[in-house]
């Protein structure tokens, strides 16, 4: 992993200002970003990693008059174990519980999971092992996720749709139609 500066933002405004300076990335729980940095998957390696962990209220899980409010820094394990979420939004509690391993759930955040980089194994294949894969997302010409082994691939962010995505395999048995 290359060297980078680490800034712990104390407010959303401070995090935004650090991002505006350029060559910076945000870190929520950091579970995905750490691997991305180690494998040098970003087109431009950041000079600064901006942590959001110290921003007050970002980890909020609260029932309000208009519904459930989840902060971007809400940890998945906290959502899964929240008594209010489990009693009033059991599908959400079940979905949060079904993500990854317990160790990852104890660190991973809602915002980080929404914003994480592409999880395709062709895209993430390290250039240092057996040469670079000619991946379309890495300025190549082919999408191996469409043509190769793809049964465990995400349905979100696809360039094309080959078949109806999922119904029973998605968290909380959500039925997401083809788009």
Where are these regions (language model features)?
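C-terminal structural segment of proteins
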Residues: 1-171, 177-178
């Amino acid at each position: 992993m290359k060297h980078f500066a680490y800034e712990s933002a104390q407010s959303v405004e401070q995090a935004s200002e650090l991002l505006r300076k350029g060559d910076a990335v945000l870190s929520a729980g950091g579970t995905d970003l750490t691997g991305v940095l180690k494998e040098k998957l970003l087109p431009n390696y950041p000079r600064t990693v901006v942590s959001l962990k110290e921003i007050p209220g970002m980890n909020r899980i609260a029932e309000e008059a208009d519904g459930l409010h989840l902060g971007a820094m809400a940890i998945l394990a906290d959502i899964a174990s929240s008594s209010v979420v489990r009693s009033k939004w059991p599908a959400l509690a079940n979905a949060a519980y079904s993500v990854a391993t317990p160790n990852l759930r104890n660190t991973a955040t809602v915002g980080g999971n929404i914003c994480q980089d592409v999880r395709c194994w062709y895209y993430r294949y390290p250039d240092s092992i057996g040469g670079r894969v000619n991946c379309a997302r890495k300025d190549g010409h082919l999408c191996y996720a469409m043509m190769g082994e793809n049964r465990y691939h995400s349905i979100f962010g696809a360039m094309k749709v080959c078949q109806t995505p999922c119904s029973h395999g998605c968290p909380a048995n959500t039925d997401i139609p083809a788009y």
